[in-house]
Design a protein with these regions (language model features):
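Ordered, amphipathic secondary-structure segments that act as subunit-interaction surfaces
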Residues: 75-112
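Canonical alpha-helical transmembrane segment with a positive-inside/aromatic-interface signature
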Residues: 100, 125-188
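Alpha-helical transmembrane segments of multi-pass membrane proteins
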Residues: 29-32, 58-59, 63, 86-93, ...
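C-terminal ends of transmembrane helices
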Residues: 30-41, 89-102, 145
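Small-residue-rich segments of transmembrane alpha-helices in multi-pass membrane proteins
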Residues: 50-60, 84-86, 109-121, 163
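Membrane-interface helix caps and helix-loop-helix hairpins in membrane proteins
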Residues: 38, 70-73, 97-101, 122-127
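Alpha-helical transmembrane segments and their membrane-interface boundaries
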Residues: 1-70, 74-78
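Juxtamembrane membrane-interface segments at transmembrane alpha-helix termini
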Residues: 59-66, 93, 117-124, 141-150
Length: 192
């Protein structure tokens, strides 16, 4: 069986095709999860795999209901609920550190795209899922290096400074102006 034949087979509704869809979701979740695990993120292999498998099963369930029950059923509604639910899961991965750094955005986006990939696999759009998987891996691997280069060559920096009183803030700003350093943005808040 050639690749086109395999893709056509996976698009059918049979036990073998269902198994292939779920195994494809497992592979996709593991591949994305490995990248996050290597970077020691909270959502790693197991989380990404479960999200991808679960969303695949939801889409398979939608297709099953559509194929086997009389009535008008919009199978996209189940997928929409998966995306909504994964949004809540993703929020749990995003934190703001004590130094006002936002962490976990890539993990949240990875969980979201993993759910989308699972939905694509579940409905039988295997070729789209694997093409997207390749692009996701390129994004996580290659673009992180590009992002690092952009940050390293940026002329701006982010500073997090704690002052004991407002007078010191004014002194700091005055000193920056004397040194001809431009402050493009700043935020003040009371310490906890």
């Amino acid at each position: 069986m050639n690749l086109i034949g395999l893709i056509d087979y996976v698009g059918e509704w049979s036990t073998g095709a269902i198994v292939l869809r779920l195994v494809s979701a497992l592979i996709i979740g593991v591949v994305i999860g490995i990248d996050r695990g290597i970077k020691r993120r909270g959502a790693g292999i197991k989380t990404h795999t479960l999200v991808c498998l679960g969303s695949t099963l939801v889409m398979l369930t939608g297709q099953y209901v559509y194929n086997n029950f009389v009535g008008n059923m919009d199978i996209s509604r189940l997928g929409a609920q998966v995306i909504s639910g994964v949004g809540f899961l993703g929020v749990g991965t995003i934190i703001v550190t004590g130094r006002n750094q936002v962490r976990g955005l890539t993990t949240a986006a990875g969980l979201w795209v993993c759910a989308c990939l699972g939905l694509a696999v579940g409905i039988g759009f295997i070729e789209g899922a694997f093409i997207t998987l390749v692009l996701v891996i390129i994004t996580l691997k290659l673009l992180s290096k590009v992002d690092e280069q952009v940050r390293n060559h940026s002329k701006g920096i982010d500073l997090y400074i704690e002052f004991e009183n407002n007078k010191n803030v004014t002194l700091f700003i005055d000193e920056m102006r004397k040194q001809d350093i431009r402050i493009s943005d700043f935020e003040l808040g009371k310490s906890k």
